[in-house]
Amino acid sequence: MAKQLLFDDTARKALERGVDALANAVKVTLGPKGRNVVIDKKWGAPTITNDGVTIAREVELDDPYENLGAQLAKEVATKTNDVAGDGTTTATVLAQALVHEGLRNVAAGAAPSGLKRGIDAAVDAVSDQLLSMARDVDGKGDIAHVATISAQDPAVGELLADAFDKVGKDGVITVEESSTTALELDFTEGMQFDKGYISPYFVTDAERQEAVLEDAYVLVHQGKISTVQDLLPLLEKVLKAAKPLLIIAEDVDGEALSTLVVNKIRGTFNAVAVKAPGFGDRRKAILQDIATLTGAQVVAEEVGLKLDQIDLDALGTARRITVTKDDTTIVDGAGSSEDIAGRVAQIKAEVERTDSDWDREKLQERLAKLSGGVVVIKVGAHTEVELKEKKHRIEDAVSATRAAIEEGIVAGGGSALVHAVSVLEDNLGRTGDEATGVALVRKAASEPLRWIAENAGLEGYVVVEKVRSLEVGSGLNAATGEYVDLLAAGVLDPVKVTRSALRNAASIASMVLTTDTLVVDKKEEDLAVNGGGHGHGHGHGH
């Protein structure tokens, strides 16, 4: 494929136009008075959103050079979203400001490498300052405020405060679409997996069609159980202990299953068999999770444990197990808290390592099931367009709240950045182009606040100067137009979101400033014209 090249200042200007196109589309959504953006879809209703990363993902420009700039700006939004789950618009606005001012200085003769060193040093200093300004999330009130600011809806804030109260910071909160118009919260205590009883004869509560085992043993088996000889020695021991038994295995069939069913019907003892969830390596991992939670050992040939040789100490126990035809819930497993904490740490390390979104989601689910439960928030709305927009806002709010619990909170409304750059007053002792790089960050940091104010119909630069003169923690509440103590008023931002936005913006801006050449594919029509197609037919009609 033939390539086109663009060099020097012309190349950087093209990148800047691309960054501008994307940033201008995104920054109108900033703040409580921000506008929405409507995105056309190839099929179905258009999407209405005020989420920076959703808008950014849709932007593709016609000019290939400008498109490179837009894609770089898109990277700012997606990276911030991956790390913090929110703050994508802030990150894009910061990147635009750094690129603008930076390129002006490069055109005036500043060395891009010097600017980059200054920017990096400034970002590190501001990032540390933000951390020192942060305070820990304190109870449901703070969580409700953070979620309210992110979703721009107090009802969502209250609901998420309840959700996190129930499942803790590692718990899974999933957002699903509902057929009603209401917002609802479903909480599942303990570990639940999507496999039910193998035979309906195991049911203990005929009315609810579920099997309930109180204070039960749990057998976790990696293979199939078909022959009753393998199972009999264990069943006799369980019978003596007079406790019910849950069997989780790849499958239970043949005479092993019929023996369990017959004994259940006769009332000799109460047992329920369910298939293991998942498949392949994921099934092995989930079985180990269940074993850790209940204090069991996974019975498998590969670890030298045979079913006909095990004692009761290889079984786990749980206070209550409920099995329906579709799923199994284990509440209060007897696994030791150290083992569970170790398993949780191991899964967290896997989450950090994985590149696949699907794997990450599945690992997060396993994490939640080990650490306390699952909340499902059901979102309803009057139209499909409104439903999608609402669901998106709530997902963002969940991410923002999680980020807040992790690293703490600072005053919102763009004021934390304006106050944090006070550490750059002396340009960090740098000189020359590095000092200019530090100054770039100091100037760019006020842009999110300026656009929050502009979108609220106020004079941006005036607001920035006013907030700068206020003490740390105070700023503009754009929803009311008043200058208040933002921490007291509940206008809060997760510090992780603000730091990620600044870091990712600086990273992309530095790339643009140090770029000198752009290489893109030549367009098809250019190739056709230059190739001079001489394939004309000369058929003469008689």
Swiss-Prot record:
SUPFAM superfamilies: GroEL apical domain-like (SSF52029), GroEL equatorial domain-like (SSF48592), GroEL-intermediate domain like (SSF54849). One of its GO terms (biological process) is protein refolding. The keyword Cytoplasm applies. GO terms for molecular function: ATP binding; ATP-dependent protein folding chaperone; isomerase activity; unfolded protein binding. It is an enzyme of class 5 (isomerase). The keyword Chaperone applies. It catalyses: ATP + H2O + a folded polypeptide = ADP + phosphate + an unfolded polypeptide. InterPro entries: Chaperonin_Cpn60_CS, Cpn60/GroEL, Cpn60/GroEL/TCP-1, GroEL-like_apical_dom_sf, GROEL-like_equatorial_sf, TCP-1-like_intermed_sf. Pfam families: Cpn60_TCP1. Its main location: cytoplasm. It is found in: Cytoplasm. GO terms for cellular component: cytoplasm. ATP binds at T29, L30, G31, P32, D86, G87, T88, T89, T90, G413, N477, A478, A479, D493. It comes from the Bacteria. Its EC number is 5.6.1.7. Keywords: ATP-binding, Chaperone, Cytoplasm, Isomerase, Nucleotide-binding. Gene3D superfamilies: GroEL, GroEL-like equatorial domain, TCP-1-like chaperonin intermediate domain. PROSITE patterns: CHAPERONINS_CPN60. Belongs to the chaperonin (HSP60) family. Together with its co-chaperonin GroES, plays an essential role in assisting protein folding. The GroEL-GroES system forms a nano-cage that allows encapsulation of the non-native substrate proteins and provides a physical environment optimized to promote and accelerate protein folding. Forms a cylinder of 14 subunits composed of two heptameric rings stacked back-to-back. Interacts with the co-chaperonin GroES. This is Chaperonin GroEL 1. The lineage of its organism: Bacteria, Bacillati, Actinomycetota, Actinomycetes, Kineosporiales.
